[in-house]
Every structure is written in structure tokens, then in C-alpha cells.
């Protein structure tokens, strides 16, 4: 199941079902995070995926009077483009890297975005980069880019 499939199931469900599905969705993203984390061969305490209010933050965007408006998942169903694909982002906010004492060293935003039914891993370090998830090599490339971002951040501190 892709993130996109999972998200489509979340809309218009009861809060109880929604919460359970959020957890499944978060697990899906944490899978990406763990692949990225395993690529790090630097001495860090832990890497964790932080989420908005303990759950992934799902939102749709739509255009209104020439400007883009962002709405959260509990306000209305996804907005569809003319070609039928939804304007949806799925964010797993930030990966926190801590030292052995649990002190935060750095945090690098890492999210998954759905665009034209393609899943993308988005990493914002010194540079912004998107990786279309079409096979495992894309995840490995994202992991390598993330690792480089981490090393650059650590060099600054």
C-alpha cells in the first residue's frame, strides 16, 4: 500500500478509525526514516520521526482568488485538480538527531509528498531535494542525501 492509498482511506472516517490509520501511515513513513537512519555511520544517539500532535499532519491545498490555501484533514475532503489527481501533501514533520545524552543536536525536515500520484521523499537540509519513490534505489539516494545534510549540519555545530 502506498502512502497515497492509505491517505485516501483516512478521509471521511470516524475519529477512532482515523487515529488507527494515522498510526499505520506513520509506520509507513518511519520505514523510510529507518532506511535513512541505517545509512548514517556517524555516532549519534537516536533518530526519530516527530509528528504534528503525535500523528502525521495531512493537508490538502487549493487555489482561492489566485492564492494557495492550505487546509487540514478534518476540514474537508481532498481537493482534486482538473485531471482528477488530488493536491495532497503528507508530512512527517522532522527527524531529530540527538547525542548520547539525549540532547538535540540537529533537526532536518523530511516529509513525503504526493504529486500526480507519485510519492516523493522531500529532504530539506542546506539544500532542498525531492526523490520520487519508484524503487528502492530512490530511497537509498534519499538516505545518502540525508546523510550528507546531517554531516553538513554537524560540521556547523
Predicted regions located by residue number:
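Glycine-rich, aromatic-bearing surface loops/beta-hairpins
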Residues: 107-157
